[in-house]
Amino acid sequence: MNRIVECVPNFSEGRDLQKIDRIVAPFRGKQGVKLLDYSNDEDHNRLVVTVVGEPEPLRDAVLEAIGVAVQLIDLNKHQGQHPRMGAVDVVPFIPIKNVTMEEAIALSKEVGAEVAKRYNLPVFLYEKSASAPHRENLAAVRKGEFEGMAEKIKLPEWQPDFGPAERHPTAGTVAVGARMPLVAYNINLNTPSLEIAYDIAKKIRFIGGGLRYCKAMGVELKDRGITQVSINMTDYTRTALYRAFELVRIEARRYGVSIVGSEIIGLVPMEALIDTASYYLGQENFSMQQVLEARIME
């Protein structure tokens, strides 16, 4: 593939494996499209797909998968720990190779317009594609979630960019946009107290005075009897993963709580992991040029 765009659509289904297979199917066996990864979480009740491709075939595959999700998912029956406003909650496009951010923005707008036309879904443009500053942050767009969107969408400042100014009865609304790569990173705590997880999340996220380029929320993992700080690092080159990990560790100590593990959702840029490994190993003057795989791929 000469020109590569990444797309990481998030679907509000993490439990029904048959539905998950049907949603992922449009990304398989397509010329110019490669399915890199998909992961589902039962507690979050969410599916995250990572796919790359040439802009046009990728667009077609994404539109097909959205159609399957709209058909299969009824948010009136959906329960999960992760905030959601749509059956297809968010569809970000990330320029990877020989594609500019401006081209990724244009692609996101093309997909958004077609989603509204084809599936009668209200579409909000967010991040780099946002039509207004207050729509850049996904959390602001999604505030109120599926249930609250029935009234929110009627407000003048929250009219959708494409589609009807009315929440879809079963599929809700969707956010589509272009952005830089982010790292979805979850840190698990050995406490069942959701209040503690909430408090730690508030302390580490930027909006609460914490780390720049860090979004965080507290999540309960009922099946394991623990809680989690669920994090999005929106620019890992400016705020490294290890900074989030260490700050969570510091804040957790105040409650006599420790970290029992962490996980990365979806794929992660090599540089983000190498940066973290270099920090904990105390490397001096280390660079990507010393990584064997990086040199081979040049």
Regions found by a protein language model. Give the residues of each.
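Long, contiguous binding/interaction regions
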Residues: 1-298
